[in-house]
Amino acid sequence: LSNKKEKNKMISYKQLGFVNTREMFAKAFKGGYAIPAYNFNNMEQIQAIVVACVETQSPVILQVSSGARKYANHILLQYVGQGAVEMMKAHAKEKGLKPIPMALHLDHGDTFELAKSCIESGFSSVMIDASHHPFEENIKLTRQVVEYAHKHDVTVEGELGVLAGIEDDVSAEHSTYTDPKDVVKFVKETNVDSLAISIG
């Protein structure tokens, strides 16, 4: 019964019309192009992002910070996300263009609970930023998120290294560059799909 309730309350990103970043990144790597990832906080921003990306025929990653998610409410964000996909299709049709792939991504999530909640409410990709933790703890937390996310075909971005400053409520006084040797171990032990690194 509890499993049935869990499935009933979960909204898959596929129901909202999003894709995960796995195939998106593979095509970009093969084609030699970059994919824009934009954080949005209001209707005007998301409209501008969708129109620009449709008209340039660019795949896009719509990013939501943990702060923006708290502000907007996760239920409302589902409808905003779904609306963005529908707007994309309508604008593409109006302009005689192809629909574009769109991903909905949690930017700088810092807990398993937040990542899980986003996965259950229609996000197709999540970032778990445990870079402020010791290396082994970062591996452990990232692996936990990856194991849950991959059950639902959601992609995960990890982070290694720290940039000084404040980004999405994550603050650091000093920069720590990413050690390439750590990257090999981190990716192998977490099975993460993509990785944010600190190179200056």
Protein language model annotation of sequence segments:
Residues 12, 33-41, 68-69:
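A short N-terminal beta->alpha junction/helix N-cap motif
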Residues 1-9:
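Short, Lys/Arg-enriched N-terminal segments with co-localized hydrophobic residues
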Residues 100, 104, 108:
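Aromatic/His-enriched, Gly/Pro-containing loop or helix-boundary segments
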Residues 11-12, 36-37, 101-102, 132-133, ...:
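Short, contiguous strand/loop micro-motifs
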Residues 33, 98-101, 152-154:
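A short helix-to-beta-strand connector/capping loop
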Residues 35-39, 104-105, 127:
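Short catalytic-loop micro-motif centered on adjacent basic/acidic residues
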Residues 10-28:
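N-terminal amphipathic/basic leader segments beginning at the initiator methionine
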Residues 21-27, 43-68, 74-91, 95, ...:
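Alpha/beta enzyme core
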